[in-house]
Regions:
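Surface-exposed, low-hydrophobicity segments enriched in Gly/Pro/acidic/Ser residues
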Residues: 1-451
Length: 451
């Protein structure tokens, strides 16, 4: 799914974008122009086939007049005896069994004895300053090895790339200086461990009376990152739970209805799932950077609903990560209809503190339209003001920014079928300059929409 400014857009040649799988590209259609003011998020799933994998899922439901229950399970397990991308030797299996979940330990020497072949890059072993190293050799009388070199980072290895040719690259040993490695390659091969992910979920709803609705969900996960090893298995199991209660305070079918809503999410740090739990911009909404620990998301609010006139919702949210984050957010949403007037407003204000930053984030989007029989006119006002400061010196971070935009538009036709709409948008962008948020540019956009 592709999101623009947090909203999903449609895929297709006659819609917003297409995907070229051969080139690995997302191409936006000419009917969906991209500007520098847009935030683009691509949400996708992939699976690496390193072992034969067995996937099983299923579920069941139970329902009565007041109670609904659902149970589902999901399991994906790599067969550790059926590798697809690597042939593991007994020595390499032993390395994996001692590595636990630490990928930095999942490496093995890559040198393999090889007979002389003029079409291959081969190495011999040689003592250099008391260290046994691989040295490029073309002498058929030497004991030769085929060696794979892995990039390990600057000053993390003892080999450097000295020559590239049509057959293969040639690497050369460089002795450490004062104990500091001088290369960025090592004669190792990274081993990939078989994994397991299992999920069990039970959810349901209970309606003890006409005015009360209760929804609940509990899930457990088991995520083993190395089936060859029992080390580090203490963090395999995780739990997540959700409870939502809606209580109708005033309930009349043809009039305004008032409800109170309480919602609680608990997610342990070790809980794993196969897809995201929240919206694509959850981290941006809360100014999250690197949250750690168990998560608690608590919310409470009021919902005012009228069958013909729309709704208004106020919600207070509290988000906590046990090790380094605490935040509170107020949300106000309204979508109302008064004869020919339509009013929409979505605003929020966030205050949070982490071990690194504190921030205040104000957001507001508002739209008012007036409809004629086959025409409409309207205006929009949107603003954001995001100030993030580092705890250590109270300076603004580069993510601090602010904007305001004003828009007017008019259209004719049926906005859900065939229509033409023209409009004008003025936007002012502010960004960080010399530790101050200052105006950096303005834009004026004239547009025509049609269908």
């Amino acid at each position: 799914t592709v999101y623009v400014n947090g909203l999903p857009i449609k895929r297709g040649e006659s819609e917003d974008y297409i995907i070229d799988y051969n080139a690995g590209e997302i191409i936006f259609n000419s009917t969906f122009p991209i500007t520098s003011e847009m935030r683009i998020t691509v949400d996708y799933q992939f699976s690496e086939r390193n072992f034969s994998r067995f996937t099983v899922f299923g579920g069941s439901n139970y329902e009565t007049e007041k109670l609904k229950l659902g149970v589902s399970v999901y399991s994906e397990i790599d067969s550790k005896n059926q590798p697809l991308q690597q042939n593991l030797s007994p020595e390499q299996v032993a390395i994996l069994s001692n590595a636990g979940d630490d990928e930095s330990l999942m490496v093995a020497p890559s040198g393999v004895p090889e007979v002389y072949n003029e079409n291959r890059i081969l190495y011999k072993k040689e003592l250099i300053d008391g260290v046994e190293a691989f040295v490029f050799s073309t002498n058929p009388e030497d004991e030769l090895f085929s060696v794979k070199f892995q990039a390990v980072g600057e000053n993390q290895g003892d080999y450097i790339l000295v020559n590239s040719n049509a057959i293969n690259n040639i690497y050369e040993y460089v002795a450490p200086i004062a104990g500091v490695p001088q290369g960025n390659f090592a004669p190792i091969v990274r081993l990939i461990a078989p994994e397991k992910l299992q999920l069990a979920v039970i959810n349901g709803s209970y309606r003890p009376s006409e005015k009360t609705d209760i929804y609940f969900e509990a899930a457990g996960s088991k995520n083993d990152l190395n089936l060859f090893s029992s080390l580090d298995d203490a963090n395999n199991d995780g739990f997540a739970g959700k409870l939502r209660v809606k209580q109708n305070i005033i309930k009349k079918d043809s009039l305004w209805n008032l409800s109170a809503i309480v919602d609680a999410d608990l997610i342990q740090e070790n809980f794993k799932t196969i897809q995201r739990l929240y919206n694509a911009e959850f981290n941006r909404d809360w100014n999250l950077e690197s949250p750690r620990g168990d998560q608690q998301l608590l919310s409470a609010g009021l919902e005012l609903l009228h069958p013909q006139k729309g709704l208004a919702i106020y919600k207070f949210e509290h988000l906590n990560f046990s090790e380094n984050f605490n935040g509170n957010r107020h949300n106000l949403l309204a979508s109302l209809r008064f004869n020919r007037w339509n009013v929409f407003s979505n605003s929020s204000i966030l205050n949070n503190q982490s071990d690194v930053t504190t921030s205040t984030f104000l957001r507001s989007f508002n739209r008012v339209t007036y409809s004629f029989d086959k025409q409409w006119i309207g205006t929009k006002l949107a603003t954001e003001d995001n100030e993030q400061r580092t705890v250590s010196n109270d300076s603004l971070t580069p993510l601090s920014q602010r904007f305001k935009s004003y828009e007017i538009f008019t259209g004719i036709g049926d906005s859900t079928k065939v229509f033409v709409e023209v409009g004008y948008k003025h936007r002012v962008n502010d960004s960080l300059r010399l530790n101050r948020i200052e105006k950096v540019n303005t834009s004026n956009t004239y547009y025509v929409k049609s269908k």
